């Protein structure tokens, strides 16, 4: 096990970068950096103990797991193992009881892309001690030769059940018109070992190419009455559905927003960028309790921007789409993720930001956390990266970042590139 400490806190000067967003007094902490062996770390995920913000657990590609006992100031790194294999798409979520779950893709033969069994199921592993140790894991969606991909999960309010949703590919990457993708969901008790038979959620199927016309981006959330809600992207639309019986059955899909240009977006220095939706619910006792939020990126204004819509009636009707980034036109913001503070009800969105550049082609990239205390009506954009980075566009950079927040303790997590080497970082953002 490897321990990495926070770098010395830097005093952030009010320089020209303040002109494009509020400069948060944050310290950046590195969780990991590629050591030259195996896969480079990316696609980070992070979760905070709901009753003890000092305990934070994170993960990254391919099988990295990190834990902190001081609110993210220092981290211990380990490798996650499972008899079912560990092959990326890390999803770390916390239970109201303080358990943590790490969901990921499977590699039961340990041969990676050389194995026909790769991606044959979604795997869930549980930790009851803050990420120090993990269960062997339980699988869901095992229907070979179909491939299971792009999963995310949420735990219900009393911690008794975990729900997961993902995309099933008839054959990943296939261009055959008869091959399709669907959104599936399953659930298990708190142990996360035995999962229910998957239920199809998406009424309309997508193709298997893994692009705009593929059904992807299912991030479930739990409503205040225990309903399960989820949105995903397919073609130029964001679809929404919900279950009111604990995930056993689902309703008719609703189109709730357009995702102009599709979810498969292109950014200089990165290549393909995922603009898929993220779904959250305000479960606090604040004025917007029960509000469902959906967050995504698209190119409706020509450049890539971060967007949000919300519903106060269980998904029946949706608000006018609002832009989260507060800059002018013709600069890109991308790789968005959202969380809602379960204590305060504040909405926090993390994304990469290039508003400080002279031209849209410039690749210098900052990290911004946008926060709303009024239900998404207005936004404060804070630059949380101490310095920008400039990606070269030659590496697999991953498909997402992540963010967690409890009672004003906000921890974004992101990937950074320096001279062809990837590293994973967080920022210690503690709001009054």
Q: Model-predicted segments: where are they?
A:
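Intrinsic disorder/low-complexity segments
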Residues: 2, 17-19, 65
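Extracellular, repeat-based ectodomains that mediate carbohydrate processing or recognition
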Residues: 25-432
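N-terminal secretory signal peptides that target proteins for export/translocation
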Residues: 1-7
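Bacterial N-terminal signal peptides
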Residues: 8-21
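Intrinsic low-complexity/disordered segments
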Residues: 5, 20-22, 40
């Amino acid at each position: 096990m490897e321990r990495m400490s926070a770098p010395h806190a830097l005093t952030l000067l009010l320089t020209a970068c303040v002109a494009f967003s509020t400069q948060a007094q944050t310290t950046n902490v590195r969780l990991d950096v590629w050591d030259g062996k195996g896969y480079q770390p990316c696609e980070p995920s992070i979760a905070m103990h709901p009753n003890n913000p000092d305990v934070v657990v994170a993960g990254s590609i391919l099988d990295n797991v990190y834990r902190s006992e001081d609110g993210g100031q220092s981290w211990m790194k380990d490798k996650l193992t499972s008899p079912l294999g560990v092959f990326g798409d890390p999803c770390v979520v916390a239970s109201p009881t303080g358990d943590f779950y790490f969901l990921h893709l499977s590699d039961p033969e340990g041969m990676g892309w050389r194995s026909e069994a790769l991606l044959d199921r979604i795997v869930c592993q549980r930790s009851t001690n803050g990420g120090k140790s993990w269960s062997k894991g339980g699988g869901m969606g095992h229907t070979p030769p179909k491939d299971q991909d792009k999963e995310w999960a949420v735990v219900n309010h009393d911690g008794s059940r975990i729900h997961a949703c993902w995309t099933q590919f008839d054959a990943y990457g296939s261009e055959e018109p008869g091959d399709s993708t669907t959104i599936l969901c399953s659930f298990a008790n708190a142990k996360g070992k035995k999962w229910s038979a998957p239920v199809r959620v998406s009424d309309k199927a997508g193709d298997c190419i893994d692009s705009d016309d593929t059904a992807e981006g299912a991030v479930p959330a739990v409503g205040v009455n225990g309903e399960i809600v989820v949105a995903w992207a397919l073609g130029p639309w964001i679809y929404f559905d919900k279950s009111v019986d604990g995930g056993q059955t689902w309703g008719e899909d609703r189109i709730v927003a357009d995702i102009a240009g599709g979810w498969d977006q292109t950014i200089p220095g990165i290549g393909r960028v995922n603009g898929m939706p993220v779904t959250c619910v305000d479960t606090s006792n604040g004025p917007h309790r029960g509000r469902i939020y959906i967050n995504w990126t698209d190119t409706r204004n020509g450049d890539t921007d971060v967007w949000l819509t919300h519903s106060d009636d269980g998904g029946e009707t949706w608000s006018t789409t609002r832009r989260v980034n507060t800059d002018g036109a013709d600069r890109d913001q991308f790789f968005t993720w959202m969380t809602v503070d379960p204590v305060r009800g504040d909405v926090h969105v993390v994304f990469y930001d290039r508003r400080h550049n002279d031209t849209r082609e410039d690749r210098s990239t900052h990290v911004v956390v946008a926060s709303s205390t009024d239900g998404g009506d207005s936004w404060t954009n804070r630059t949380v990266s101490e310095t920008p980075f400039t990606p070269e566009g030659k590496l697999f950079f991953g498909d997402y970042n992540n963010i967690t927040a409890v009672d004003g303790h906000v921890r974004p997590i992101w990937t950074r590139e320096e001279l062809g080497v990837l590293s994973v970082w967080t920022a210690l953002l503690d709001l009054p």
